[in-house]
């Protein structure tokens, strides 16, 4: 009995040791991701030529799948690659649409210019009756509607632009003929002059002549109405933060959803104000870069105030083509003191919006704002520097507008001062009012030479187009800097940082890469289950449904890996079809543009990612498996997942530092498994078994044996010859201790009685050599006998020990069998007794039920009798 208990204990301990071990298991289809900077592609509902050749058609799918997770978000390009992509891509759009194509280098010559007088071309715009004789625009809020403005009064208040009529000479069509003289009208801001000959004539050059390459746009093109969406390639996704208190930076956004594409975003490039953007909330928001940076601040207006700006160019401008030489035509314009001037009117409750902005600024936390808390000491001012920075700059119908914002800023601040914040009287500058006035409209200037801040270069475009120009834009925000050198005053300075536009549009999104391969320890060493039939699940949410389980526990998510992996593959295939259709359309029109190449790159990236995942699974022996058990032991006992409460995302972040080690062990285990499988197949191969009956194989074996025997004999002969040579050279053989030595008399030489020979030494040497060889053979025979005896005893002892072990094992199995039989007998007895008791109880209940009428009858009879 004691041995039985010991045996059972050993077996239980062994089973416990085996079950306590955990093995690495590979899961495919888990909802896990990591931040990515892969190139996104675009969708657009616009049907223009540029849109159809650069973006795929919009599918109008705005499905959002909520995730029960927390995720960090950042709205600026240095930490959000999607914002950096937008800045680069919109610049490419800008370059492609407004691409200069005619070199202006022939005009980098000396020109004789004469300043034009102040005779002004009258505007042809019909006038309206002003509602007030004091201001051009009147209304409840000093001109909230453009219809309340007198266009004639506004145009008369516009300052004259100094211009010059310049003449220059060139060879013309035939180079050996006399030079032709041409006359061109230039704005004084686009030329620089020297060596004035008199008060009116001067020598001038174009302002861009110091630059290396300057080109002029052939055609006027623009994209005022173009809106697009950024979409993640297959195998990637976009996460969106929906928290109401999101301000461009949040470490733990709790209301997170996954989307395939962003919302429609605006592509209007501006400085200072955000035009035609998207409204997020019905309230004013202040976003600061990295939460505490006051040099990059984004203010999003409340849509309740209905802010907008309407720009128009008065008059009918005529562009004159000047043929310089064959194949080179330059565009000039008529003499006019308002060559490039326009005006814009700001509509809506701007003062109410500005009051709410100031209130939001003083409500900022102390770690984000340390300026004054008095809203009366917060002022809005413009920037200094390049024209694009000091003015409100944007593109309207292909023309570049530069707005001097002093009048409008005075209106918002309700102050009367100049650009240097010096109080002054509203004196007129000629027919135009001075800088110290309050207006809801400002003067715009159209420029042809602009500064490209993205490439740090200059670009020259054609003069303004003919006809009437007008465009209306909604104002959704502004980019500013918060400057407070003292606590008595805070300056809100308009900023030319274009990147903030895309931060406002895409700041709630982040691009992530789906990593569907995960590792976790399980008690199963290898996959032993049979084939299970799996239900086909319809793709209700497609690719987004794959990430819907991101917030669920690991155990629940692992149970639906098959469906999730199908969602992943279905989303990849659908996106590939859409991208391929767009690329084919671009190929047919021979317009594979820069963005078309990006779309093609997104398609290739998705295929590469999917093939890379499958290649990794195949290298571990887990190809096309959702759950793959391996033979690699999990060595990190202090890291185990909580299958009921932990998500896959949390678990993968815990073991991120172990991934390279895990993958290396899986690859080594797979290689060893393949080697073992190859060796096993060779052992179990029937071709190898029947090869033993091949006569040629036996001949080879005999040949090898014969060669071995010949080699041994040859070595023995060489050894014998070598020994003989050594003995001959020595001249004697040492006497063996076994040879008897005859005793001779003292002083008597050997064989002294026999005359003649000098003794019998040769015969004695030969006999001793033969006896020595015989003794060596006897020693070898004795050694072999002892070796044989030792081998026999060892084998006998081993067999005895094995027999004893087998007897112990047989005895233990017999005891286990006896114990199992006793347990079964006991269980059978208990079951029999239980069944018998149940039978008795049922029979008693049945009898009681059956006998109830009889007993009732008997009771009634007794009562009645």
Swiss-Prot record:
Region (V4): 403-444
Protein modification: Specific enzymatic cleavages in vivo yield mature proteins. Envelope glycoproteins are synthesized as an inactive precursor that is heavily N-glycosylated and processed likely by host cell furin in the Golgi to yield the mature SU and TM proteins. The cleavage site between SU and TM requires the minimal sequence [KR]-X-[KR]-R.
Annotated stretches, region: V1: 113-165
Record keyword Disulfide bond present: yes
Region (Immunosuppression): 600-616
Annotated site location: In-frame UAG termination codon: 770
UniProt-annotated stretches for the region Fusion peptide: 537-557
First and last residue of the signal peptide: 1-20
Domain of life assignment: Viruses
Residue ranges that the UniProt entry lists as topological domain Extracellular: 21-705
Keyword Transmembrane among UniProt keywords: yes
GO BP of this protein: membrane fusion involved in viral entry into host cell; symbiont entry into host cell; virion attachment to host cell
V2: annotated span: 166-209
Site (Cleavage): 536-537
UniProt region (V3), positions on chain: 311-343
Annotated motif YXXL motif, positions: 732-735
Stretch list, region V5: 487-494
UniProt function note: The surface protein gp120 (SU) attaches the virus to the host lymphoid cell by binding to the primary receptor CD4. This interaction induces a structural rearrangement creating a high affinity binding site for a chemokine coreceptor like CCR5. This peculiar 2 stage receptor-interaction strategy allows gp120 to maintain the highly conserved coreceptor-binding site in a cryptic conformation, protected from neutralizing antibodies. These changes are transmitted to the transmembrane protein gp41 and are thought to activate its fusogenic potential by unmasking its fusion peptide. Surface protein gp120 (SU) may target the virus to gut-associated lymphoid tissue (GALT) by binding host ITGA4/ITGB7 (alpha-4/beta-7 integrins), a complex that mediates T-cell migration to the GALT. Interaction between gp120 and ITGA4/ITGB7 would allow the virus to enter GALT early in the infection, infecting and killing most of GALT's resting CD4+ T-cells. This T-cell depletion is believed to be the major insult to the host immune system leading to AIDS.
Protein name stated in the entry: Envelope glycoprotein gp160
Organism: Simian immunodeficiency virus agm.vervet (isolate AGM TYO-1) (SIV-agm.ver)
């Amino acid at each position: 009995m004691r041995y039985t208990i010991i045996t059972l204990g050993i077996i239980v301990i062994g089973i416990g040791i085996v079950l306590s071990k955990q093995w690495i298991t590979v899961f495919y289809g888990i909802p896990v991701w990591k931040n990515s900077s892969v190139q996104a592609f675009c969708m657009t509902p616009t049907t223009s030529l540029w849109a159809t050749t650069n973006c795929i058609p919009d599918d109008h799918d705005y499905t959002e799948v909520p995730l029960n997770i927390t995720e960090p978000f950042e709205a600026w390009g240095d930490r959000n690659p999607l914002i950096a992509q937008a800045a680069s891509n919109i610049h490419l759009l800008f370059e492609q649409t407004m691409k200069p194509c005619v070199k202006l280098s022939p005009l980098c010559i000396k020109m004789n210019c004469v300043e034009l007088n102040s005779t002004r071309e009258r505007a042809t715009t019909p006038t309206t009756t002003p509602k007030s004789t004091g201001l051009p625009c009147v209304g409840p809020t000093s001109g909230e509607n453009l219809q309340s403005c007198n266009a004639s009064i506004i145009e008369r208040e516009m300052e004259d632009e100094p211009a010059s009529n310049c003449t220059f000479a060139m060879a013309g069509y035939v180079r050996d003929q006399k030079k032709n003289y041409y006359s061109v009208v230039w704005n004084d801001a686009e030329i620089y002059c020297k060596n004035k000959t008199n008060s009116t004539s001067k020598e001038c050059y174009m302002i861009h002549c110091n630059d290396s390459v300057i080109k002029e746009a052939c055609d006027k093109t623009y994209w005022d109405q173009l809106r697009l969406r950024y979409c993640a390639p297959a195998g990637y996704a976009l996460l969106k933060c929906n928290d109401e208190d999101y301000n461009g930076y949040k470490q733990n956004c709790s209301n997170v959803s996954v989307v395939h594409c962003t919302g429609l975003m605006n592509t209007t490039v501006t400085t200072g104000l955000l035009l035609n953007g998207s409204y997020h909330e019905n309230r004013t928001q202040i976003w600061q870069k990295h939460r505490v940076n006051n040099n990059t601040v984004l203010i999003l207006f409340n849509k309740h105030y209905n802010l907008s700006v309407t720009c128009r160019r008065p008059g009918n401008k005529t562009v004159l083509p000047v043929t310089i030489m064959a194949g080179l035509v330059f565009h000039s314009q008529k003499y006019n003191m308002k060559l490039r001037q326009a005006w814009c009117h700001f509509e809506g409750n701007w003062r109410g919006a500005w009051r709410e902005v100031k209130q939001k600024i003083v409500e900022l936390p102390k770690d984000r704002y340390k300026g004054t808390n008095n809203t009366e000491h917060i002022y809005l001012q413009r920037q200094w520097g390049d024209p694009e920075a000091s003015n409100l700059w944007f593109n309207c119908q292909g023309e570049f507008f530069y707005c001097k914002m002093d009048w409008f800023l005075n209106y918002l601040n309700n102050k009367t001062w100049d650009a240097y914040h010096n109080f002054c009287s509203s004196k007129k500058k000629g027919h135009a009012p001075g800088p110290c006035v309050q207006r809801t409209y400002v003067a715009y200037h159209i420029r042809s030479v602009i500064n490209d801040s993205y490439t740090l270069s200059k670009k020259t475009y054609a003069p303004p187009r003919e006809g009437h120009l007008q465009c209306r834009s909604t104002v959704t925000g502004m980019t500013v800097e918060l400057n407070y050198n003292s606590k008595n005053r805070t300056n809100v300075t308009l900023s030319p940082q274009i990147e903030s536009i895309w931060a406002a549009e895409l700041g709630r999104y982040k691009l992530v890469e789906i990593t569907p391969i995960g590792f976790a320890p399980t008690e199963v060493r290898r996959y032993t289950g049979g084939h299970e039939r799996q239900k086909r699940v319809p793709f209700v949410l497609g690719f987004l449904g794959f990430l819907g389980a991101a917030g669920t526990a690991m155990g629940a998510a692992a149970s639906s890996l098959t469906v999730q992996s199908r969602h992943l593959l279905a989303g990849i295939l659908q996106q590939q079809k859409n991208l391929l259709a767009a690329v084919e359309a671009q190929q047919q029109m021979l317009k594979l543009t820069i963005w078309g190449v990006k779309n093609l790159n997104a398609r290739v990236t998705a295929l590469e990612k999917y093939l890379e995942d499958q290649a990794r699974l195949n290298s571990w022996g887990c190809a096309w498996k959702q759950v793959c058990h391996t033979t690699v032991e999990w060595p990190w006992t202090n890291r185990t997942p909580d299958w009921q409460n932990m998500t896959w995302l949390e678990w993968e972040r815990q073991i991120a530092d172990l991934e390279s080690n895990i993958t290396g062990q899986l690859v080594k285990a797979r290689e060893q498994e393949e080697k073992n499988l190859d060796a096993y197949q060779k052992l179990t191969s029937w071709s190898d078994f029947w090869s033993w009956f091949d006569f040629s194989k036996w001949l080879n074996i005999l040949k090898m044996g014969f060669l071995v025997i010949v080699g041994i004999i040859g070595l023995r002969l060489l050894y014998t010859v070598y020994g003989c040579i050594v003995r001959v050279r020595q001249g004697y053989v040492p006497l063996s201790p076994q040879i008897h030595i005859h005793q001779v008399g003292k002083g008597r030489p050997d064989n002294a009685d026999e005359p003649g020979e000098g003794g019998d030494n040769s015969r004695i040497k030969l006999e001793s050599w033969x006896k020595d060889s015989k003794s060596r053979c006897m020693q070898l025979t004795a050694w072999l006998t002892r070796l044989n005896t030792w081998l026999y005893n060892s084998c006998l002892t081993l067999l005895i020990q094995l027999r004893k072990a087998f007897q112990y094992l047989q005895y233990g199995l017999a005891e286990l069998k006896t114990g199992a039989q006793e347990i079964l007998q006991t269980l059978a007895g208990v079951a029999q007794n239980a069944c018998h008791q149940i039978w008795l109880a049922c029979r008693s209940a049945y009898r009681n039920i059956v006998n109830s009428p009889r007993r009732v009858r008997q009771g009634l009879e007794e009562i009645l009798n």
